[in-house]
């Protein structure tokens, strides 16, 4: 993995209710395409980026959660967003094959408008249905 110089703090957004000391691991279905088993666990230095991911991942009846996490191994820039629409890694998104340790739950994040969440979910679903979405895994 390429050395990344961002040292955090790091956040992960999810629909899972976890406890301090738990570990997030790769090897589960993608939140965006259930046909894909993820080889990496993703995280960001942007708290509101993690919260948006959690809100998109969470079902309508599920509560999104944002956690302060600590990588337990090497990590790299997320190739799904790095050097795509914009040069570099403006989303400050990373991924690792090593687990992320839950340090704390974060509650001071921005709730996105439901229509924005629904719109992005619909776009993801349409791209997945039409096989136009590819996760670099």
Regions found by a protein language model. Give the residues of each.
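ADP-ribose/NAD+-binding catalytic cleft of ART/PARP-like enzymes
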Residues: 1-41, 55-56
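Active-site and NAD+-binding cores of ADP-ribose-processing enzymes
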Residues: 5, 13-15, 22-23, 60-137
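Conserved aromatic
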Residues: 43-45
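Short active-site loop/helix that positions an aromatic residue
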Residues: 47-61
